[in-house]
Amino acid sequence: MKLPIYLDYSATCPVDPRAAEKMMQCLTLDGNFGNPASRSHRFGWQAEEAVDEARNHVADLIGADPREIVFTSGATESNNLAIKGAAHFYVKQGKHIITCKTEHKAVLDTCRHLESEGYEVTYLDPQSDGLLTLPQIEAAMRPDTILVSIMHVNNEIGVIQDLAAIGELCRARKILFHVDAAQSAGKVEIDVDAMKIDLLSLSAHKVYGPKGIGALYVRRKPRVRLEAQMHGGGHERGMRSGTLPTHQIVGMGEAFRIAKAEMAEENVRIKALRDRLYDGLKDIEQVFVNGSTEHRVAGNLNISFAYVEGESLMMALKDLAVSSGSACTSASLEPSYVLRALGLNDELAHSSIRFSIGRFTTAEEIDYAIGLIRDSIGKLRDLSPLWDMYKEGIDLSKVEWVSH
């Protein structure tokens, strides 16, 4: 077993060797290196063929038509293109957007930008388990609502929203439905037709593909129109100009093909490892799982260890690659905004650790992690005066602290 152990698959995944192998064949002179937009020679035709094959694999995973797949640089760009693109195109129909407070920053900050352009955004509060209810979303809808943007699986707490019900509601009200599926593709079944999704953002590196490539699903029937955010040669049906990176697209296609073939079997194995990890930790005193345990992606376990600082625990767990909050925001020392939105106090939010398990995690690694975590929690609590006070039965919420 090699140290450190990687338990941060929600931040990124290593590229599957099968996808990496395919990518290597699209880089050098003796490989498929051409520009897919070069129509006048074989190098271009072969590259275009490879891109088309990958596009089919991406479409297959979500039940889409390949013509509905637009390649982008990743889910952040896809979210920007979907939300800004739809908001700008349909501005005459209204300027109201609905989203959730626990969305990824790529959605929240895009919405904030639109607010500066005069759009109105309703940010819904999730329930304490991280899920939204249908009446909540329906109550927020107005005659001028043009878009609802809700993520499928949350990147921090792994909860799965009921997209089919939300899609049904949006379609009945003739409101566009955008889904950030960066964390769910390859882990949870997605059917864009059955779920009545109009726009769906995808990322390759969360599905064991390369970084720097993603896609946006844009429905053709009923047709969804977007205003391009990137202008140039008119690639990707005018929605996203720029030379297509054949090697990255091929890597993404192969990763999505593997995901479709192996997802069901892989989920059983990963969920067993996740349960093994939780079973090894659940009898520690004052340990809380954040987010719904029932509606949850297989590889995610987000736990708060009361009376232990998340940052100090991460330092103690230097042999484990885990995160406190998401990688995109964990550089700040603020408590997770996702956990705050669930109603957790600052102390519990600060004491949270996200473990995310993936394709290459082993039972041996999980057992090692359990031992290390239990040992570290014990040592850190021994150093904590707050833990001593808690053990003495003092209600810390009633203590009046004196500032110096």
From Swiss-Prot:
Pfam families: Aminotran_5 (PF00266). Its EC number is 2.8.1.7. This is Cysteine desulfurase IscS. One of its GO terms (molecular function) is cysteine desulfurase activity. Master enzyme that delivers sulfur to a number of partners involved in Fe-S cluster assembly, tRNA modification or cofactor biosynthesis. Catalyzes the removal of elemental sulfur atoms from cysteine to produce alanine. Functions as a sulfur delivery protein for Fe-S cluster synthesis onto IscU, an Fe-S scaffold assembly protein, as well as other S acceptor proteins. It catalyses: (sulfur carrier)-H + L-cysteine = (sulfur carrier)-SH + L-alanine. Pathway: Cofactor biosynthesis; iron-sulfur cluster biosynthesis. Its main location: cytoplasm. PANTHER family: CYSTEINE DESULFURASE (PTHR11601:SF34), CYSTEINE DESULFURYLASE FAMILY MEMBER (PTHR11601). Belongs to the class-V pyridoxal-phosphate-dependent aminotransferase family. NifS/IscS subfamily. It comes from Tolumonas auensis (strain DSM 9187 / NBRC 110442 / TA 4).
